[in-house]
Amino acid sequence: MKKNLKRSTLCVQAGWEPKNGDPRVLPIIQSTTFKYDNSEEMAMLFDLKKEGYFYTRLQNPTNDAVAKKIAALEGGVGAMLTSSGQAANFYAVFNICEAGDHIVASNEVYGGTYNLFGVTMKKLGIECTFVNPDADEEEIQAAFKPNTKVLFGETVSNPGCNVLDIEKFARIAHKNGVPLIVDNTFATPINCRPFEWGCDIVTHSTTKYMDGHASQIGGAIVDSGNFDWNANAEKFPGLCTPDDSYHGLTYTKTFGKMGYIQKLVAQLMRDLGSIPSPHNSFLLNMGLETLHLRMQQHCKNAQRVAEFLHDDPRVAWVHFCGLKDDKFYSLGQKYMPNGSCGVIAFGLNGDRDTAIKFMDSLEMIAIVTHVADARTCV
């Protein structure tokens, strides 16, 4: 694949690169196993001495092609797909954290992520301190501890629609020798590429805009390849010291910039197994092929709806960074000048019953537990 292609081209062309006589459309490789002619070749695959496929719980050609497409869209060195966005955020953090470690995260994140970091990971011995992302750098810095391993935030928060100051968060993270992980689900790489602003690792719930049709659940983790794990090797022993389960292999030494992704695949996916089905990845790829077109229209639609709601006296407040009087307008213009996403947060004048009456009166707009697909929902 040529370098410096437009993101619209990458949506269609990246990932699956058919050879002479191969299917033009990404095929669904619906197989758990892969045949080899001799045991030596299989042994080399098991020991990570050769690239290839041997069991779909780790890697599969369909999944791999879609992961490569998402990595290309974000401008990363590699990616791994997961069975959900929740799995992606868990794996992204757990790949570099263990019992006794600490993370710092924005408190403006998806509720499921808040519970994952604040409740579930605590049971695994990983503590989290949540911070106000709009606070000054000194206040956020105060949350860091000697055992802090990650700083986490969302480009556009779910559901509050706050915009993260990625450059500020990157400065703080790197000052403390840790990576910045950003969930880029709402913005997508069409509207924002966090790596261009200092972020190190990006996650996605591909269930949302990337799929775009509410047809599959999935997630993705993309590594920029820019974070120097060995500069603070004592913080990241899982990456920078030998892995006994692979005969003393060291991920950063053996795989270089791909060390983080290789550990995700070879160790965590091997042991925890949150892999998407090849069929789900095929559906995701179909959605990605039109992502650049859909995001343009989503943003146009959302802008018009936000302006309508903003001017309606029955509406108490609207959060959408495309509005000039929105608190995050300047950050939105900085990081997403062509539009943020199609999600709007707003409140009505009245009480809970007012909100219920409004929702129950909707005709074309559906009440669902979802956001960010082709059909307007609430």
Feature roles, as predicted:
Residues 2, 8-17, 79-311:
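Conserved PLP-enzyme active-site core in the AAT-like
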Residues 8, 24-28, 51, 78, ...:
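A generic secondary-structure signal marking the coil-to-beta-strand transition
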Residues 18-20, 210, 273, 334-336, ...:
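Short Gly/Pro-enriched turn/cap motifs at secondary-structure boundaries
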Residues 38-90, 112-120:
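Conserved N-terminal alpha-helix of the aminotransferase class I/II PLP-enzyme fold
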Residues 295, 303, 310, 314-378:
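Conserved C-terminal alpha-helix-loop-beta "cap" of PLP-dependent enzymes
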